[in-house]
Amino acid sequence: MAQSNAFNVVEATIDDIHAAYKSGQLTCRQLVQMYLDRIEAFDKKGPAINAIITIDSDALKEADRLDAAYKASGPVGPLHGIPVIVKDQADVKGMPTTLGSVLFNDYYPDRDSFVAENLRKAGAVILAKATLGELGGGDTHGSLFGSTRNPYDLARTVGGSSGGSAASVSANFSTVGVGQEGLASIRRPSTWNGITGMRPSAGLVSRGGVYGCWPEIFGSLGPMARTVKDLATLLDVMVGYDPEDPITARGVGHIPDTFTNFLNKDGLKGARLGILRESIGLNAEPDSEDFRKISEVFDRAVGELKAAGAEIVDPIVIPKIKELLAKRSGGPGETEQSFKNYYGRSAKSPFKSPQEVIDSPDFAKVVKRSQDRFKRNPDAAKHYESLRAQDELMTIFLKVMADHKLDAIVHKAVEHQPTLIKDGVNPPFVDQKGAPHLNTFLVYVPTIVVPAGFTRDNLPAGVCLIGRPYDDGNLIKFAYAYEQATNHRRPPASTTGL
């Protein structure tokens, strides 16, 4: 079937696509083919963004099935015919879960992750799996694929670890994407690729079928999109109770009928926002010119928040924040338990234990920092200290919000511009430079980033909002109001056309 020349897929929203389906202007097959053409032109060729690891060979067949269903009885669900790209850390049956590593190139899970299953039920087309920091952490480099390039500057990294998802959404390889965050793995690449991304409150989204999120309440899948409305629509589908992930029991009672009910362009009017100016980014250099370029954008953003009706408390101070963040550590047996919890879902585990992974001849090909993280020796004393610091920081954070009567806290989404790829691969490198890791401790609070414009170097920057536990809806409201007031999103020039 010929493609629809009248429909422009670049920056198309879920509403745009559904309106085109309804009018007969577009079919799901045509849309999927448009995205496949863009992936071929801009990910594999041209600028060679290198954000995609695996494309679903049955994507067009699934599109045909959805077109037939639509013709027979209307949309299958809220994401009918919407192409989604998923970070290659979450299982999607029919595609390998590689973790970006040669070690797992041939691992095909025998079932969907909880979120992938929800996406299918909602009518989405899971188009592809995206690149990531190898083994699920760090900047987006891996032994299986190399490095992913930032579509705004091909010499720079996309960030990580959900860099492939972020670049794919920004470059219009799909309508929306799914990332995973433990430290800043959704927010940092979303910021550096000029899109919006959210790490929901722990317990809203299941960790079932996602590598590296267990046993600690550490990681969560989250939505990534070019607009806050699309993000909210995707989040509606991702959330829910999963009997296989006990932590989702905590989310019961905190899930609204739809997060889109919170979308209000006047949502910032009367909202009290505290501005956190203290540097909390990893390896940040507050006296550098690069840091100042981000600060300029952030200062403008604070003014824009105020102009949109927010009451600004500037600055606010979170006592002991750096001291407590410095005590963050991995848990004892974290790799061992993560391995068991994840591969225990499948009858096709490629390795029996982490030690077997380490003993594999291919382990030497893994990015060095990913090797180090995987081999990390447990330290029970440091882990205990970390848990105490986590609890103390959570109490301090909530007290600051209560003392100032705040609805949210705002800080720089990332404190530096995207780093050069060469700096992230070969020593001396700066991994995750400027990434704020406050929410690594505050796992039950939601956090969202929104584009805030561009630096003097024409690179994307963003603002990050953090709210109270399970106040995800209001955080979406504030983000949407800021987005509508500013419209900072701009697609990258390197992937224009088609």
Residue ranges and their predicted role:
Residues 2-98, 102-105, 135-137, 247-251, ...:
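Short, well-ordered alpha-helical
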